[in-house]
């Protein structure tokens, strides 16, 4: 492959991807120490600020990075430019997630899957104009060995080698070697390149290689990549060109242009520290090789990124590792490169994050020279065609002869014939493609299916012909048939509608008839009823008429008689009528009176009933009120009891909170003092280191000036070298001191974060509801605090965590600067100022003397430590003896208490006359020594044996003052008690005073031992100092 086209320099584009805090970092209480400036591609950590081409924070979308950084590289790939995407950063910073090398099951997460989609989408749009061929390869560099992840033989061996991630030796297959062609292109001899034509095939290759890649678990990452992986996509394209003829018209002849470009997608293994990852054995060796390759990459970036070195033509150490050798074109060569720096925002990773940002900032200065990669033959043909066109144009301008015109016509005829032949060739090629496709289908299916497919095709063709004939014959009748079908369909719909309506009418008619039958039955019954009534009325009418006729007959008979009798009868009837009318009036009055009485009675009954109802209602209300009063009283009693109980609990809680508050205040104050002291120590160490680093430059210049002087300044030069060596050693010690303070501060922050996590967990559990038990001691300890105390403690811990995080970031910055200066100083040469062998010998002699003095001091310190250990052993032995004596004294005190209790009980009952002399004799007969209680004098704690030597020595010094009290006679004890105004002198006066003395004490038997101890102490304090017996140690 040969490069063509004009080359233009372009810088390496750098993008920074800040991942969010992960779960483990949140549990540890890590704070975000990286700040992304809104609206600007800037990132800030501590006092350092960096500007890059692109910065993506934790809230940025992954599609933004692809659209802004990767899409231009994919477009350039179709133009023939090589491209490289490089993911660099600390272990666990999200490089594999960002690149997408952990491809599984069609996942679209990461840059590589998006690149594949964009590639095939663009190929689909251009496949009618350009012929494409795609090849992929996938390798990894594990422990400086290149492994092919797409090799089938390697895949068969990968399962057996999964326990050991070392080199897999495949029989009969040579190892992959890195070669460089004559034109400077880096190639891999022996690697597998797979041709792919679909997105699915390329995804299968990526997934296959991802599963074969070496991974492992560390303390910082469960799925840590243990190798550098490079996924390469090679795009070959054949472009067809239409050259222009000499007369300016487009020529029919076709020419081809072959372009080949590569896209390297590099997922580097993360830099790691063995102390933090906790790796050992095989993991440790892998980490060493990873850091070695990244160090070589950093040296290459430093050499290419320094403009001064680049102008001076300083050697670039590409050959220091296989990683830099493979990335030789990507860094400073024929490629467009984008470097993605993945960083962690956690303050615990501040040092590694700062180093990553410095490397990325240095990589921005690297200048690449990308060019279009063309085939040598096509490039030469293109040049010759351009030259031919130029000559033809010049010939036409000068006016050619007739022979030239004939030749031009012949050329045009030949080109037309060539074009016809090309068309025929294209048709034949398309037919061959169809035939090949049919052959593939025939191979996939059975002969019967192939034959049936052919018959079906023939049948379809004949049916199509028949259909065409029928359409031509009955084309005119089709409209009439369609109209008849439409009318028939409309009639059917109308008929169905009318049937439905008829059915509905029938149903309604049946309902009305049934209603009429019901109404007819009622009419007959009414006719019968009213007929009977009419007959009854007619009978009554006839009876009344008969009565009337009879009365008229009587009247006629009477009128026919004499008038006297008529008058007499008339008078009689008149009197009877008057009497009857008088009776009727009386009856009416009585009836009215009865009616009034009935009304009054009804009113009184209603009033009585109303009163009775009111009485019942009042009684019910009375019962309800009594029941309610009882309930209210019970509720008030319960409420009062609960309030009193709550008041007691609140008082108790208040006392406990007050105690906890004082305790937490003391703890916070102590932790703040410790944290402040450690922060001040760290600040002093970093300040001292900074001053030493600044002084190193001036000292180096002074030493260089002294070294360039004449020979008379030999003594001065020697002293200067000695001062320079002392200064370098002091710088090294201070760097170690700052590193030690950094580790201590990390441990303190981890402890604070653990306590904060426990308290937040307890707070969350309490907010959800009280839990029956706590699984961990930390949770139990956190649950013992009250909510207010817990909130105060959480706030204090968060404040201290903030201080600790700021201190960690500051120390990480100083350590990074110190390491960078040390690396730069080491690269320039530490011993360049040694100008002669004599200076080297003098400096070596000085170093030997200093080392001897250090060894002597170390030997003396070792002797002192051994002596102190022996003293500590003796003190621990004495302490154990004192503890044994203390236990014996406690046993003796228990025996004495039991004896005193028996004596008191016996004296109180009067059953047995036991005097104090028997107790005195019992005490005299005891041979075990009695000492002053250690709990009061020494503040004894069970763990004092494991305490520091200073406390042990103080304890032994106090035990020397202990007195064998049991050896003293009771008379001396009594006398001493009397002299010291004690209470034992009253015991010997009489039995009555004995009882009086113990009367109120015996009411509290649990304080008897305390009272006896207090009496013993009083006696001991009252003894003269000359009589005190001490132990000799």
Curated annotation (Swiss-Prot):
Question: Keyword ATP-binding, does the record have it?
Answer: yes
**Coiled-coil intervals in this record?**
525-638, 863-895
Of the GO CC terms on this record, one is:
microtubule associated complex
Q: In which tissues is it expressed?
A: Expressed in cotton fibers.
Name the protein family: Belongs to the TRAFAC class myosin-kinesin ATPase superfamily. Kinesin family. KIN-4 subfamily.
Which proteins does it associate with, and in what oligomeric form?
Answer: Homodimer.
According to its UniProt entry, the function of this protein is described as: Kinesin-like motor protein involved in the control of the oriented deposition of cellulose microfibrils.
What is the name attached to this protein's record?
Kinesin-like protein KIN-4A
Identify the species of origin.
Gossypium hirsutum
* Gene that specifies this protein: KIN4A
